[in-house]
């Protein structure tokens, strides 16, 4: 089913969405404008060579998705160009995601690890939402180091980091390319059910409440509570 529009709680969200629609003739407004909400909007086909493109340089803080393309003859060249584009053209350094087939990772070999190392982002997710890094208290969460008060972008410093890493640069998260049970048919031994943070997981609220209870007192007896709910794949 279709999820309803989310509340745009950032001040000025409605005006920013309207400005984007007015300045981009190809903008697609996905929803009818609901009362007191901001409709989801998509702007496709931006020119990656346009250094003045506002959507590359400003954070919307509203449900606007934009897409662009970069050249590349083969995965290796494409990945290098994509990393360069992100580092040099996009404003903000908090999180980035690479969606990549496991076979491509294997084919690229060390070049894939080099690409991760070159990305100037505080959290890099490989086939997983980078925001999971915020949910894991062990990982440092913050912008890539190097911002100043004159150009603060995504901020300075870190939160969480319960393992007390000294001067961390970035966190890298890996997730399964195939969701369970399809992963089993592809030879990937991952048993991850539909993640509880997915909007279509009907058990998400129950799972997260029970995991919160476990985090509160670390009583192993609480573990059987959320696991059966998770195994139901959000049904």
Residue locations for each model-derived region?
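Generic surface-pattern signal
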Residues: 1, 19-26, 117, 121, ...
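NAD(P)-dependent aldehyde/semialdehyde dehydrogenase
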Residues: 1-94, 106-107
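Hydrophobic transmembrane signal anchors and adjacent membrane-proximal interface regions, especially
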Residues: 4-10, 14-15, 26-31, 174-179, ...
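Generic structural signal of hydrophobic/aromatic residues within well-ordered alpha-helices
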Residues: 16-17, 52, 112-115, 207, ...
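C-terminal core of ALDH-fold dehydrogenases
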Residues: 35, 78-202, 206, 232-234
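C-terminal non-catalytic accessory extensions
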Residues: 207-235
């Amino acid at each position: 089913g279709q999820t309803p529009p989310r509340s745009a709680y950032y001040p000025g969200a409605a005006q920013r969405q309207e400005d984007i629609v007015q300045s981009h003739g190809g903008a697609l407004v996905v929803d009818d404008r609901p009362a007191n909400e901001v409709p989801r909007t998509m702007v496709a086909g931006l020119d990656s060579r346009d250094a003045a493109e506002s959507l590359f340089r400003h954070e919307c803080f509203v449900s606007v998705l934009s897409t662009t393309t970069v050249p590349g003859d083969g995965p290796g060249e494409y990945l290098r160009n994509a990393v360069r584009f992100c580092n040099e053209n996009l404003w903000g350094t908090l999180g980035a995601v690479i969606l990549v087939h496991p076979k491509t990772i294997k084919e690229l070999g060390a070049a894939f690890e080099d690409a991760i190392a070159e990305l100037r982002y505080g959290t890099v997710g490989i086939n997983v939402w980078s925001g999971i890094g915020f949910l894991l208290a062990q990982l440092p969460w913050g912008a890539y180091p190097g911002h100043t008060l004159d150009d603060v972008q995504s901020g300075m410093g870190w939160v969480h980091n319960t393992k007390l890493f000294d001067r961390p640069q970035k966190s890298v998260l890996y997730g399964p390319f195939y969701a369970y049970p399809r992963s089993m048919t592809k030879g990937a031994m991952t048993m991850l059910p539909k993640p509880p943070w997915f909007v279509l997981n009907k058990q998400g609220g129950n799972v997260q409440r029970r995991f919160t209870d476990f985090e509160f007192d670390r009583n192993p007896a609480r573990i059987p509570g959320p696991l059966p709910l998770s195994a139901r794949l959000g049904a």
